[in-house]
Swiss-Prot record:
Disordered: annotated span: 1108-1136
Family under the similarity heading: Belongs to the RNA polymerase beta chain family.
GO aspect biological process, one term: DNA-templated transcription
Biased composition (Basic and acidic residues): 1108-1123
InterPro entries: DNA-dir_RNA_pol_bsu_ext_1_sf, DNA-dir_RNA_pol_bsu_external_1, DNA-dir_RNA_pol_su2, DNA-dir_RNAP_su2_dom, DNA-dir_RNAP_su2_hyb_sf, RNA_pol_bsu_bac, RNA_pol_bsu_CS, RNA_pol_bsu_protrusion
Species of the source: Heliobacterium modesticaldum (strain ATCC 51547 / Ice1)
Purpose: DNA-dependent RNA polymerase catalyzes the transcription of DNA into RNA using the four ribonucleoside triphosphates as substrates.
Cellular component, GO annotation: DNA-directed RNA polymerase complex
Keyword Transferase: yes
Subunit structure of this chain's protein: The RNAP catalytic core consists of 2 alpha, 1 beta, 1 beta' and 1 omega subunit. When a sigma factor is associated with the core the holoenzyme is formed, which can initiate transcription.
Protein name listed in UniProt: DNA-directed RNA polymerase subunit beta
Pfam families associated with the record: RNA_pol_Rpb2_1, RNA_pol_Rpb2_2, RNA_pol_Rpb2_3, RNA_pol_Rpb2_45, RNA_pol_Rpb2_6, RNA_pol_Rpb2_7
Top enzyme class: transferase
Encoding gene, per UniProt annotation: rpoB
Length: 1154
């Protein structure tokens, strides 16, 4: 049963059988709500906590009354352009009261610029877009655990009270049923000592508290204190060893540790969890521990020891909570405020009371620094992944267990990383990185939301047990609430009234999957896709893919490069519109009205209220990852527009739907070994018609600074450079927009002053006669790096004179943007949505590709062996359905007769998509495969027609494009959605002739970024040894590596066309000799005729030659000057020793003379 639904402007035919009962929430609300809470509540809460600040005498009081955020100085676009932070000034109203005089001063104090969140849930920090990732941490509260003591096999129990900030309190038992307590991770004490210290002085009172429990009696026997005072002193000795204990200091220590709100904070969530776990009802406002908490915690531990309690599972999502932007910011702001508080107190005592004002007291530096540090360098403040809209969206919904106060990769075991039953509907079981972070970083599920305590909730439909009806009432449940109920699956069949059709249904209870009678069911899932995240919900036929491959599919969609021509998938899941809409890359109408004017970069809407709305579109901007951000209008003049409607497509969107790749005709067959190891064979048509062409924009910057020798200058006048090289530079020396550049071309001409050399008398005379010659400068222009090329699309110039804010010491800053059009090429990585990835091995002429009976050449050939062992069958079903929907006539679906309008788009939602039968029916309706239309000219007409009749549905006979012969077997063909991933061969290919060498080892540097060489490692040396390739090996170990003299002479010989000389001694060999000598071995090198070979330092002529040839043989020029060395820096070791000895000798002689 297939029916049409509207996905934005486009119609899709969906196979979903389950009606959606609720709309999906806004997908970035986790960021927005949290930040809104911070601005409205979080800030106020902190000022309330810190206020009032009193001096040590209690005479001066500083109160924070109210705060207000001003207007930001620049818009979001301007901030990106100027490299500044998108922030608003925070002003706080402060009151200073002098108790002696009764004087009250009120003032508004500026407390720094506070970064604001953009509409898209991001922050602009120093011009870069960043995202604050939510952190999954253990919730404050009380936790019980049990373990087995290995020798005795007895169960041991423990309890831990974890605060949001403050000292931990831990209880534990031993094999003799003693109960011990640890305060703040110190040595353990009998728990009764703590109970006495709380004011229950004698044994009778302690026994009475716990109804004379036997285990308390056993513990009392070990307790050598008699009353409260002794107990306090005993605790003080453990916490402050070496200090003289007094009862008062001990009492105040215990008070501050657990009962002082300033030093101990359970937070709202900690109090809620403790009350819930221990079944007590302390006021929600009391955020420190109370006596009742501690007594109740011990009672619960005793129950556990008797065998009628339960231990807690720390990986359960009821015990882990999220710290989102707001809370992370609040914690950081609190650190800044507490530092400021210290400064205020100090200033209160120092300053003169008469002239003191709030402004004088408050130093905002610590607050500003704390915020800046958080946004700039916290592990959770991340550079936004902006490869495509899905990458942006997923980044904002990411949940990380790493970061300050969280886990570390090394410490995290298997249990923490594993999928847990409480993840259902809250955290996606599929989407997580491969590699060391697996399971520590997750993604929020589609319908999940965060409650006030930071726990993740998921929606369920309430079942009315009286009437046996599934109602439309939606309840959001946290993980520990859900464990109490029995929850039916979303695919349980219901009738019109909402009653279950069957007597027994599949349901979940805790971690059990049960088949239960309908009467027992409490709740029902709202949607089949509530289990998975956005990226996973975009994979059609997910239910037919192995989880490991689905994980790769979900992750690789985030790496798809936005293409020049977008194309939404034929086979989607119905999520494409929502994902693109909420990612914020499309332009959305703010008000309803009619389109008055549309151009490439602006849309004007005449609104219903008579005003005109201008929508500026983003044109060819660079994203964080160097991909291209470009918006193009999808509305036309005179069109009616509603508020919230998409009026322009962004990158990777097509008619408002997410479009990460292209629909291509694929065939699953082997072809001449070109599909070996998942390689992909591609039709040249995809290159010619720009199917997978993308635009990449690189940014280069050049600044002129003040140096010791004078200012650098950006200019067209560069020494020793011909006019040919300068042809594209303007009169300022900056390249013009539209110029095509190649590696080594000058982008910005810049000269730096050279040090003036000492002049001889003759030169000074000539200078005096002929006037001052132009000062010495060297060329330090910005050039296009190796392997880069393209067109200049934008140039931005910032300078001090124009009043731009630049870094200290910088006078002018030039930014140049180079755009490249990258067509698909061999070595590029491509993938489908099912984890089926591969590298392009060959691009073939269209005429040579296998073709269908109607003459259509296949566009991509994939290896069939990549499917069975990987168990991602979803790709095959997608291929069949894609083929059918491409050829489906819309009229056949609506009225049952052809209308000539070919090609529809379908949606097959996850866990509720098309079945095998649906696909067969669809293929038949679309009239595939078309055996009877083939115009056969072959002699084997009849036999072929018979074999075509036997071709199963969804397959076709293919013909070899080179010979025209049919292939032996029918082959699966159809349309698959393929993505081009951000691992492009242009970014990886690299070659080096000569280049930089490491100063220490004299060997070439490594890596493309350093223009380095390829490492020829130990195993590669073995390979050459095995072949006996002695000369190749010698060359690799000497002149191609660290034989400093040899490589210069070899280079010279090649340049001059002479024979290559014998290699010399590598630098590493000299080090080896020195190391052996340092072990006390007398090692010499002898030649064949047993003469000792002296190892010399670099000769002067070698260095000179190198200079002439323009190669930097060493990081610095260490060749000595003729005659006596001017300073010890320029000598080798032996000379240095001689020099020092001589110097000492002279000094001694002088002393003797005195």
């Amino acid at each position: 049963m297939v029916y049409p639904v509207q996905c934005g402007p486009r119609e899709r035919w969906t196979f979903a059988r389950i009606q959606e009962v609720m709309d999906m929430p806004n997908l970035i609300e986790i960021q927005q709500n949290s930040y809104r809470w911070f601005l409205e509540e979080g800030l106020r809460e902190m000022f309330r906590d810190i206020s009032p600040i009193q001096d040590f005498t209690g005479n001066l009081i500083l109160e924070f009354i109210d705060y207000a955020l001003g207007e930001p100085k620049y818009s979001v676009e301007e901030c990106k352009e100027r490299d500044v932070t998108f922030a608003a000034p925070l002003r706080v109203k402060v009151r200073l009261i002098n108790k002696e005089t009764g004087e009250v001063k009120e003032q508004e104090v500026f407390m720094g610029d506070f970064p604001l969140m953009t509409d898209k849930g991001t922050f602009i920090i120093n011009g870069a877009e960043r995202v604050i990732v939510s952190q999954l941490v253990r919730s404050p509260g009380v936790y019980y655990n049990e373990a087995i003591d290995p020798p005795s096999g007895k169960k041991l129990f423990g309890a831990t009270i974890i605060p949001n900030r403050g000292a931990w309190l831990e209880f534990e038992t031993d094999i003799n049923d003693n109960i011990f307590v640890r305060i703040d991770r110190t040595r353990k004490l009998p728990a009764t000592v703590l109970i006495r210290a709380l004011g229950y002085s004698n044994n009778a009172q302690v026994q009475e508290l716990f109804d004379g429990d036997e285990r308390i009696r056993i513990t009392l026997e070990r307790d050598n204190t008699e009353n409260t005072e002794e107990a306090l002193v005993e605790i003080y000795k453990r916490l402050r060893p070496g200090e003289p204990p007094t009862v008062d200091s001990a009492r105040s220590l215990l008070e501050t540790l657990f009962f002082d709100p300033k030093r101990y904070d359970l937070a709202k969530v900690g109090r809620y969890k403790i009350n819930k776990r221990l079944g007590i009802s302390v006021e929600r406002e009391v955020r420190h521990l109370t006596k009742d908490d501690i007594i109740a915690a011990i009672r619960e531990l005793l129950k556990l020891m008797q065998g009628d309690g339960r231990a807690d599972d720390i990986d359960h999502l009821g015990n882990r909570r999220l710290r989102s932007v707001g809370e992370l910011l609040q914690n950081q702001f609190r650190i800044g405020l507490s530092r400021m508080e210290r400064v205020v107190r100090e200033r209160m005592t120092i300053q003169d009371v008469e002239v003191i004002t709030p402004q004088v007291l408050i130093n905002i530096r610590p607050v500003v620094a704390a915020i800046k540090e958080f946004f700039g360098s916290s592990q959770l403040s991340q550079f936004m992944d902006q490869t495509n809209p899905l990458a942006e969206l997923t980044h904002k919904r990411r949940l990380s267990a790493l970061g300050p106060g969280g886990l570390s990769r090394e410490r995290a075991g298997f249990e923490v990383r594993d999928v847990h039953h409480s993840h259902y509907g809250r955290m996606c079981p599929i989407e997580t990185p491969e590699g060391p972070n697996i399971g520590l970083i997750g993604s929020l599920s589609t319908f999940a939301r965060i409650n006030e305590y930071g726990f993740i909730e998921t929606p369920y439909r309430k079942v009315d047990k009286e009437r046996g009806v599934v109602t439309d009432q939606i309840d959001y449940l946290t993980a520990d609430e859900e464990d109490k109920y029995i929850v039916a699956q979303a695919n349980a069949p219901l009738d019109e009234e909402g009653r279950f059709k069957e007597k027994r249904v599949n349901a979940r209870h805790g971690h059990d999957i049960l088949v239960v009678p309908v009467e027992k069911v409490d709740y029902m899932d709202v949607s089949p896709k509530q289990v998975v995240s956005i990226a996973t919900a975009l994979i059609p036929f997910l239910e037919h893919d192995d989880a490991n491959r689905a994980l790769m599919g979900a992750n690789m969609q985030r790496q798809a490069v936005p293409l020049l021509r977008t194309d939404a998938p034929y086979v989607g899941t119905g999520m494409e519109f929502k994902a693109a809409y909420d990612s914020g890359v499309c332009a959305i109408a703010r008000k309803a009205g009619y389109v008055e004017r549309v151009t490439g970069d602006e849309i004007l809407i005449r609104c219903d209220d008579g005003t005109t709305e201008h929508h500026k579109l983003l044109k060819f901007l660079r994203s964080n990852q160097g991909t291209c951000i470009n918006q193009k209008p999808i509305c036309h003049k005179g069109q009616r527009i509603e508020a919230g409607q998409i009026i322009a497509d962004g990158p990777s969107t097509d008619q408002g739907e997410l479009a990460l790749g292209r629909n291509v005709l694929v065939a699953f067959m082997t072809w001449e070994g070109y599909n070996y190891e998942d390689a992909i064979l591609v039709n040249e048509k995809l290159v010619k018609e720009d199917y997978f062409t993308s635009i990449h924009i690189e940014e280069y910057e050049c600044d002129s600074r003040d140096t010791k020798l004078g200012p650098e200058e950006i200019t067209r006048d560069i020494p020793n450079v011909g006019e040919e090289v300068l042809k594209d530079l303007d009169d300022r020396g900056i390249i013009r927009v539209g110029a095509e550049v190649r590696p080594g071309d000058i982008l910005v001409g810049k000269v730096t002053p050279k040090g003036e050399t000492e002049l001889t008398a003759e030169e000074r005379l000539l200078r005096a006669i002929f006037g001052e010659k132009a000062r010495e400068v060297r060329d330090t222009s910005l050039r296009v790096p190796h392997g880069e090329a393209g067109k200049i699309v934008d140039v931005k110039v910032f300078s001090r004179e124009n009043g731009d804010e630049l870094a200290p010491g910088v006078n002018q800053l030039v930014r140049v943007y180079i755009a490249q059009k990258r067509k698909i090429s061999e070595g590029d990585k491509m993938a489908g949505r099912h984890g089926n990835k591969g590298v392009i091995s060959r691009i073939m002429p269209e005429a040579d590709m296998p073709y269908l009976p109607d003459g259509t050449p296949v566009e991509i050939v994939l290896n069939p062996l990549g499917v069975p062992s990987r168990m991602n069958i979803g790709q095959i079903l997608e291929t069949h359905l894609g083929w059918a929907s491409k050829h489906m006539d819309r009229g056949v679906l609506i009225e049952g007769k052809p209308s000539g309008e070919k090609g529809i788009r379908v949606a097959t939602p996850v866990f509720d998509g098309a079945t095998e039968d649906d696909i067969f029916e669809f293929l038949t309706k679309a009239g595939l495969p078309k055996a009877n239309e083939i115009a056969l000219t072959d002699t084997r007409t009849e036999s072929l027609r018979e074999s075509m009749a036997a071709v199963p549905l969804g397959k076709s006979i293919l013909y070899d494009g080179r010979t025209g012969e049919p292939f032996d077997n029918p082959i699966t063909v159809g349309y698959m959605y393929m993505l081009k991933l951000a691992h492009l061969v242009d970014d990886k290919i690299h070659a080096r002739s000569t280049g930089p060498y490491s100063l220490v080892t004299q060997q070439p540097l490594g890596g493309k970024a350093q223009f380095g060489g390829q490492r020829f490692g130990e195993m590669e040396v073995w390979a050459l040894e095995a072949y006996g390739a002695a000369y190749t090996l010698q060359e690799i170990l000497t002149v191609k590596s660290d034989d400093v003299v040899g490589r210069v002479k070899t280079y010279e010989a090649i340049v001059k066309g002479e024979n290559i000389p014998e290699p010399g001694v590598p630098e590493s060999f000299k080090v080896l000799i020195k190391e052996l000598q340092s072990l006390g071995l007398d090692v010499k090198i002898l030649s064949e005729d047993e003469r000792e070979i002296e190892i010399k330092e670099v000769e002067e002529d070698v260095a000179e030659t190198a200079k002439e040839l323009g190669i930097d043989i060493q990081g610095e020029d260490r060749s000595e000057r003729a005659g006596e060395p001017a300073s010890p820096d320029e000598m080798d070791d032996e000379e240095e020793i001689d020099y020092a000895a001589g110097f000492l000798q002279d000094a001694l002689e002088e002393l003797e003379e005195d």
